[in-house]
C-alpha cells in the first residue's frame, strides 16, 4: 500500500463558464462563474462584484445554465458535471446562513455510446419545458422539467446526424424545437427538429438549410420579435428563420475564429462576440417594421469594439459592463464606452482577476534565501503568456531604511493637538531614548520637551485629553501636547525601577518586580488607583481594550516568571479571574488581548518562539480552546496593526509572522523579512498606512501586502512560455517560449505584437552547421501562422529579459535544463529541440544545444544532432539524460566539450517525461504508463527493473521515494505505482503495482519536489513526509505528501465520517467523484486522502464536529488509543493546513 495526502494550495483560477441572472433573489443581478470544480456566486453592484458564496462541486462543471420555470420567483441553476451528474440547484438564505439546496438530481450517463468529440452540450428550452443534452454521437437526451420531480429522469432520441457541431432551442415555437449545425461527407448543414415529449421522438422541423459555410461552428437562437437563428462561421455570419435568409462576410472576422458569444439585449438586437485573439465584436441586428406591424430583420452588422483577454466566455452585466472569463489569461471586467479612445478602442478594463492557468511548467526556488520556496510558473498562452511568482506569506515593501543598531522599542506619536497623522517616531535603546521627526519623506532627529532622553522607554504614545505619555525605567511621565511640558509624574514609592508597562488611552499598568500598580490618566494628572503583589515577578502584561468598552479595559493580562503562567486579572481590583499554567521552563515574553472577526483572543508568546493562543471571554475573563504553535526560535514580541480596516497581529521574531483570522480560524502567515525585533504601525503624511520595523542593525519603514495566504506577482511575456529552469550562478531563469508570426507577401514573417522575445536587451539567432536550410520539406504560404521559438534569459530580481536566442525556422524548443556536466566547472543551459513539419507524423530530426550565459552574453558551446524530438532532459550523475522520440539516451560530456552517446534504452512508444533519483530513472510514456530503469555504472548500460502494464496516457510523472512513483494521466486521475522488491518471482518483480488511485478532476502538466511554506512551522508532530507540488491546466496548484499508515487510517476514518455529515451540493457521492475513472475502467479511490475534504472539518459547526468525532479512536502520540475530542481533530487538521 501507499499512503498519500493530496490537497489544494491554490484553487483553480481559469474560468470555464459564466452566466448572469437572478439567482440569489428576484431583485439581485448575479454573476455565476465556473472554475472547473468551483462555482462562485457574485452580486453585481454599483461598486463592482460582491462575492456571496463559493461552492465546491464534486465534479467538473461541464454545463451551467440559469432558468426560471413557471411559478418560481427567482432563477434556478442547472449543472451537469463531466461524469454526467445532473442537478437543479436553488439558493436559500435564512439570516446569516446561506444554503444551496438540491431540488433535483440524477446521473444521465449511458452504458454505451461514444462521447462526442465536440464535448458536452447542455441547453434549456426557453419555455422551460425540457433540458436537452448532446453527450454522445447520434443521441439527443431529453430531461423533461416536471415541477415536483426530485429525480432527474432522462430519455434518448436517436439523431441520424451523427456529427453535431452545435445545437440550441429556438424561441417562439409551439413545441420545443432544436436548431443544429451538423457535418456529413458533403459538408456542413443546418437543420431543425421539433421534440415531442409524448412520443419521445423528433418531428419534422420548420426549416433547414443545406451546405452552409464549411467552418460553421456556432448557433445563436434569436428571441422574438425576430426569432430564428444566427450561424457563425470562420468567414461568414448568416441568419435563418425559414422565410428569411441573410448572410454577411465581414473581412474583419476572418483573421481569427470566434469562440464565444453573449446576448446584450433581451430582444436579441445586439450580441457580443469574442475571438481566439482576444478581440471583442458587437453583432447588430437591424430591424424593419412591415406594413402589418410585424418586425423583420433588415441587416446584420459587425463592429470591432477593442481587445480584451482571450475570452472563453462573455457575459453582459449592466450599464455597458461585461465580464470576460478567460482560460488562457486573467479574467476581466470591462466597460464598453460610447466613444472610442485614441487607439480606436471602445473597451476599457476596470478590474482584473488573476488566473495562473494553464500552468505549463514551474520550478521552486528560494530566491530570498529564507528557507522558503517560491514557485515560478509558466502560465497562460499566446498574448496572455506570463511568468507568475507565487509565494506563501506576506510581503513588506521597503520605502526607507536608516542604520540604527540596538533598538529596543518604537512608537508613533502625533505631537500636536489637531494632527490626524503621525509626525514623530520615538525609539528606545538601552539607557537612552531618541526622537525622530517625520517631515514628508524626510526623517531628522529632534528633542521633545517634557520627555527624558537618558533612560530606556518602555512605552510611549498619545493618550486622552490631548496628552502624551512616556514610561521609562524610572517613572511614568504625562506631557501636555500644547505647550509641551511635563504635567504629572508617577514614581514607585521606594524609587524602584519599573520593569514592564502597558498603557491605553486612559489607563496605565506598570510592574515593579512582583508589584503591579494601576494608574488612570486624567487632565494633567496621573492618579494611582490600586496596587497588588503577585507571587512571582511579572514578565509581561497587557491592557488593550476589547469590544465596545469606550477605550477602557476591565481586564489586565499578565505573564509570570517562575511558575510560567498566564493570568487574567480584573481592574481596578486586580482580582484573579483565570490562571493558565503554560508548562515548561521558558518564560512568557509578550502577552496580548485582541479581537479577530469579532471573536476575542489572548495570545501569549514565550522566549523560545512558541505561541499559545486562547479564546477569551471578556465578561468573565475565562480562557478556552488552548492551542500552541511555534513561530520562530527566539523571544517573540506581539503588536497589533490595522490593514484594510481589519485588526491583525504582527509577531516579531527571527521568523516574523502576521496573525490574522479567516473564516474564524487563525492563520499564521510568514513575512518576507529575515528578522524583526520590534515593530509599530505608522501613518504619516510621507508614509501613509505603513509599518516601522527594527532589527539588530536597521530601522525600516515599509507598507504591507494585502493580508492573504498566497501572493502572486505577474511578469507578462505576451507570448507562450513553455519551460523554465533556474540557474543560481548567473542568478537567472532560463525560459523557453514561442511567439506567433504571420507569413507576409515578401516571403518573410512578421511578429503579431511586441513580446518578450522581440524586446529583450540583446538577442541572437541560431545558425546551425547540422542542417542546411534547403532540407525544409515545407513551404509556408502567404498569411500562414508560424511558431518562432526562443530561449529567454531572465534576471531573477527584476525579471527583465536580458537575452533572447531565436531557434531555426520550424525548430521547436521542447526541453530545458540548467546543470554542470562531468568535471567541467561551468554551468550550462541545455535546450532540446525538434524540427517540426506539418507533413511528418513525428519529428525525424532535432538538436541538443549547449549554451553558457556569463557576463551578459549567451554563447553556443556545443550542438548535437539527434534523430527525433528531444522531449525531456535531466542531469544524471554528471551526465545528460535525454528522451528522444521512443529512446532514452545517456550522453557523457567529453573534455573537448562534446556530447557523446554512452547507452540507450528503446522499449517505449514515445518517452515524454524523465525523473531520476540515484541510479534510478522513471520514464513516463505517451500511452504506456510508467517504466523504471536502473543505470549500471560498471556495465555502462540501462536495465529495465519494472513497468506498469496498465495503458495510462501520461501527462506528468514524479518519484515520491525509492519505492513509490506518482503519475498523472489524461483523464484527470492521479495514481501511485510501487516497486515490489520483496516479490518472490521475477515476473512479479517486473510489475509496478498500482497501489494508489484518485480522481483529481484536473489535468496535471507538471510535478516538482518542493514546498511553499517554511519548513519548521508548527509542532514537530506534523504527520506528513516530503512534498510534491503540481500545476494544472486550470491554474490549480496542489500538493501531494506521504503519510504513515496509522495517520492514513485515522484520516480515512475521518473522511468517511465527514462524508456522512457534510451534504454535497447536487447530492453527488464523494466516493463516486474521487473514483479513478478512464474510458476503460472505473475503480474506487485508494491510497489517497482528500485533503480538501479533511480541511473542510474546520468550517463546519461545533455540533457537526461532535457528530464526526463520536466514538473515533485516536492515538495522541502516547501509543494508547482513546476517544478523540473535537479539539483533538481541530489540532490535527490545523497542523495539516500548515503544510501548504
UniProtKB/Swiss-Prot annotation:
InterPro entries: Beta-prop_RSE1/DDB1/CPSF1_1st, Cleavage/polyA-sp_fac_asu_C, Quinoprotein_ADH-like_sf, RSE1/DDB1/CFT1/CPSF1, WD40/YVTN_repeat-like_dom_sf. Residues 2-768 are annotated as: Interaction with CDT1. The modification N-acetylserine is found at residue 2. Residues 13-356 are annotated as: WD repeat beta-propeller A. The modification N6-acetyllysine is found at residue 1067. Residues 709-1043 are annotated as: WD repeat beta-propeller C. Disulfide bonds: none annotated. Residues 391-708 are annotated as: WD repeat beta-propeller B. It holds the Pfam family Beta-prop_RSE1_1st. Disruption phenotype: Mice showed impaired gluconeogenesis in the liver. The core of the protein consists of three WD40 beta-propeller domains. Protein, which is both involved in DNA repair and protein ubiquitination, as part of the UV-DDB complex and DCX (DDB1-CUL4-X-box) complexes, respectively. Core component of the UV-DDB complex (UV-damaged DNA-binding protein complex), a complex that recognizes UV-induced DNA damage and recruit proteins of the nucleotide excision repair pathway (the NER pathway) to initiate DNA repair. The UV-DDB complex preferentially binds to cyclobutane pyrimidine dimers (CPD), 6-4 photoproducts (6-4 PP), apurinic sites and short mismatches. This is DNA damage-binding protein 1.
Amino acid at each position: 500500500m501507499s499512503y498519500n495526502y493530496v490537497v489544494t494550495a491554490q484553487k483553480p483560477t481559469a474560468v470555464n463558464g459564466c452566466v448572469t441572472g437572478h439567482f440569489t433573489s428576484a431583485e439581485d443581478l448575479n454573476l455565476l462563474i465556473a472554475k472547473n470544480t468551483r462555482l462562485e456566486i457574485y452580486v453585481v453592484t454599483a461598486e463592482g462584484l460582491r462575492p456571496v458564496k463559493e461552492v465546491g462541486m464534486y465534479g467538473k462543471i461541464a454545463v451551467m445554465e440559469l432558468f426560471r420555470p413557471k411559478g418560481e420567483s427567482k432563477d434556478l441553476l442547472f449543472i451537469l458535471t463531466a461524469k454526467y451528474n445532473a442537478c437543479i440547484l436553488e439558493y436559500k438564505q435564512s439570516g446569516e446562513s446561506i444554503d444551496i439546496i438540491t431540488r433535483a438530481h440524477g446521473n444521465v450517463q449511458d452504458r454505451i455510446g461514444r462521447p462526442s468529440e465536440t464535448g458536452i452540450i447542455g441547453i434549456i428550452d426557453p419555455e422551460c419545458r425540457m433540458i436537452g443534452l448532446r453527450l454522445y454521437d447520434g443521441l439527443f437526451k431529453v430531461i423533461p422539467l416536471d415541477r415536483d420531480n426530485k429525480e432527474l429522469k432522462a430519455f434518448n432520441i436517436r439523431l441520424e446526424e451523427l456529427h453535431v457541431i452545435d445545437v440550441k432551442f429556438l424561441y417562439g415555437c409551439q413545441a420545443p424545437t432544436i436548431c443544429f449545425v451538423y457535418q456529413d461527407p458533403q459538408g456542413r448543414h443546418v437543420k431543425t427538429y421539433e421534440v415531442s415529449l409524448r412520443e419521445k421522438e423528433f418531428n419534422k422541423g420548420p426549416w433547414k438549410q443545406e451546405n452552409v459555410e464549411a467552418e460553421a461552428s456556432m448557433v445563436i437562437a434569436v428571441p422574438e420579435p425576430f426569432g430564428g437563428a444566427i450561424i457563425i462561421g470562420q468567414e461568414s455570419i448568416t441568419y435563418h428563420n425559414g422565410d428569411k435568409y441573410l448572410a454577411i462576410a465581414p473581412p474583419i472576422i476572418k483573421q481569427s475564429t470566434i469562440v464565444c458569444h453573449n446576448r446584450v439585449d433581451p430582444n436579441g438586437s445586439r450580441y457580443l462576440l469574442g475571438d481566439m485573439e482576444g478581440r471583442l465584436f458587437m453583432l447588430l441586428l437591424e430591424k424593419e417594421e412591415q406594413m402589418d406591424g410585424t418586425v423583420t430583420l433588415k441587416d446584420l452588422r459587425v463592429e470591432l469594439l477593442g481587445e480584451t483577454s482571450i475570452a472563453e466566455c462573455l457575459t453582459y452585466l449592466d450599464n455597458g459592463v461585461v465580464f470576460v472569463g478567460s482560460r488562457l489569461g486573467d479574467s476581466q471586467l470591462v466597460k464598453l464606452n460610447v466613444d472610442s479612445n485614441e487607439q480606436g478602442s471602445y473597451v476599457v478594463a476596470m478590474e482584473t482577476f488573476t488566473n495562473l492557468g494553464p500552468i505549463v511548467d514551474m520550478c521552486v526556488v528560494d530566491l530570498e534565501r529564507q528557507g522558503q520556496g517560491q514557485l515560478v510558473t509558466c502560465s497562460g498562452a499566446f498574448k496572455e503568456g506570463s511568468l507568475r511568482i507565487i509565494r506563501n506569506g506576506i510581503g513588506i515593501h521597503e520605502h526607507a531604511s536608516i542604520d540604527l543598531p540596538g533598538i529596543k522599542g518604537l512608537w508613533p506619536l502625533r505631537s500636536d493637538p489637531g494632527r490626524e497623522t503621525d509626525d514623530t517616531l520615538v525609539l528606545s535603546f538601552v539607557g537612552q531614548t531618541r526622537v525622530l521627526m517625520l517631515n514628508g519623506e524626510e526623517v531628522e532627529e529632534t528633542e521633545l520637551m517634557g520627555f527624558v532622553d537618558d533612560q530606556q522607554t518602555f512605552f510611549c504614545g498619545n493618550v486622552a485629553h490631548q496628552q502624551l505619555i512616556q514610561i521609562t525605567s524610572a517613572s511614568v511621565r504625562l506631557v501636555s501636547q500644547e505647550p509641551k511640558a511635563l504635567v504629572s509624574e508617577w514614581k514607585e514609592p521606594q524609587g524602584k525601577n519599573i520593569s514592564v508597562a502597558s498603557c491605553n488611552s486612559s489607563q496605565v499598568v506598570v510592574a515593579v518586580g512582583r508589584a503591579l500598580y494601576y494608574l488612570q490618566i486624567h487632565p494633567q494628572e496621573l492618579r494611582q488607583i490600586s496596587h497588588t503583589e503577585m507571587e512571582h515577578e511579572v514578565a509581561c502584561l497587557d491592557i488593550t481594550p476589547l469590544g465596545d468598552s469606550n477605550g477602557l479595559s476591565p481586564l489586565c493580562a499578565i505573564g509570570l516568571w517562575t511558575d510560567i503562567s498566564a493570568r487574567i486579572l480584573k481592574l481596578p481590583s486586580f482580582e484573579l479571574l483565570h490562571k493558565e499554567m503554560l508548562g515548561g521552563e521558558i518564560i512568557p515574553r509578550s502577552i496580548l488581548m485582541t479581537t479577530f472577526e469579532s471573536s476575542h483572543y489572548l495570545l501569549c508568546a514565550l522566549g523560545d518562539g512558541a505561541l499559545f493562543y486562547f479564546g477569551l471571554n471578556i465578561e468573565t475573563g475565562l480562557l478556552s480552546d488552548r492551542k500552541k504553535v511555534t513561530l520562530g526560535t527566539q523571544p517573540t514580541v506581539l503588536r497589533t496593526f490595522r490593514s484594510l480596516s481589519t485588526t491583525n497581529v504582527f509577531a516579531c521574531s527571527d521568523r516574523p509572522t502576521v496573525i490574522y483570522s479567516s473564516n474564524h480560524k487563525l492563520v499564521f502567515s510568514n513575512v518576507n523579512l529575515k528578522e524583526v525585533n520590534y515593530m509599530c504601525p505608522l501613518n504619516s503624511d510621507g508614509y501613509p498606512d505603513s509599518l516601522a520595523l527594527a532589527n539588530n542593525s536597521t530601522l525600516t519603514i515599509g507598507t504591507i501586502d494585502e493580508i492573504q495566504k498566497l501572493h502572486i506577482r505577474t511578469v507578462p511575456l505576451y507570448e507562450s512560455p513553455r519551460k523554465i529552469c533556474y540557474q543560481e550562478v548567473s542568478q537567472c531563469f532560463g525560459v523557453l517560449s514561442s511567439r506567433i508570426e504571420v507569413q507576409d507577401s515578401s516571403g518573410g514573417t512578421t511578429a503579431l505584437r511586441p513580446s518578450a522575445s522581440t524586446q529583450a536587451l540583446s538577442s541572437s539567432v541560431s545558425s546551425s552547421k547540422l542542417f542546411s536550410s534547403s532540407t525544409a520539406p515545407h513551404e509556408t504560404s502567404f498569411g500562414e501562422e508560424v511558431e518562432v521559438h526562443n530561449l529567454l534569459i531572465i534576471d531573477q530580481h527584476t525579471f527583465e529579459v536580458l537575452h533572447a536566442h531565436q531557434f531555426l525556422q520550424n525548430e521547436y524548443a521542447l526541453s530545458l535544463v540548467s546543470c554542470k556536466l562531468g568535471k567541467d566547472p561551468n554551468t550550462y543551459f541545455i535546450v532540446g529541440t525538434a524540427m517540426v513539419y506539418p507533413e511528418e507524423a513525428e519529428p525525424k530530426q532535432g538538436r541538443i544545444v549547449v549554451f553558457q550565459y556569463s557576463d551578459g552574453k549567451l554563447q553556443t558551446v556545443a550542438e548535437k544532432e539527434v534523430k527525433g524530438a528531444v522531449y525531456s532532459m535531466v542531469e544524471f550523475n554528471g551526465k545528460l539524460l535525454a528522451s528522444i522520440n521512443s529512446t532514452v539516451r545517456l550522453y557523457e560530456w567529453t573534455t573537448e566539450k562534446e556530447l557523446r552517446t554512452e547507452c540507450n534504452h528503446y522499449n517505449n512508444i514515445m518517452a515524454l517525461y524523465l525523473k531520476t533519483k540515484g541510479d534510478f530513472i522513471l520514464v513516463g510514456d505517451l500511452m504506456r504508463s510508467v517504466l523504471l530503469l536502473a543505470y549500471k555504472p560498471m556495465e555502462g548500460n540501462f536495465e529495465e527493473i519494472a513497468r506498469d502494464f496498465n495503458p495510462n496516457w501520461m501527462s506528468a510523472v514524479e518519484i515520491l521515494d525509492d519505492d513509490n512513483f506518482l503519475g498523472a494521466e489524461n483523464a484527470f486521475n492521479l495514481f501511485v505505482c510501487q516497486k515490489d522488491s520483496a516479490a518472490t518471482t521475477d515476473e512479479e518483480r517486473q510489475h509496478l503495482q498500482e497501489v494508489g488511485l484518485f480522481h483529481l478532476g484536473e489535468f496535471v502538466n507538471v510535478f516538482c519536489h518542493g514546498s511553499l511554506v517554511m519548513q519548521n512551522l508548527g509542532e514537530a508532530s506534523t504527520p506528513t513526509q516530503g512534498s510534491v507540488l503540481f500545476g494544472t491546466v486550470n491554474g490549480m496548484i496542489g500538493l501531494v505528501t506521504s503519510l504513515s499508515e496509522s495517520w492514513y487510517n485515522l484520516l480515512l476514518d475521518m473522511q468517511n465520517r465527514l462524508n456522512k455529515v457534510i451534504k454535497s451540493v447536487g447530492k453527488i457521492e464523494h466516493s463516486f467523484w474521487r473514483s479513478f475513472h478512464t474510458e476503460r475502467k472505473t475503480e474506487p479511490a485508494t491510497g489517497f486522502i482528500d485533503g480538501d475534504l479533511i480541511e473542510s472539518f474546520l468550517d463546519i459547526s461545533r455540533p457537526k464536529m461532535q457528530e464526526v468525532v463520536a466514538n473515533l479512536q485516536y492515538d495522541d502520540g502516547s501509543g494508547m488509543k482513546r476517544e478523540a475530542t473535537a479539539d483533538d481533530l481541530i489540532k490535527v487538521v490545523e497542523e495539516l493546513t500548515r503544510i501548504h
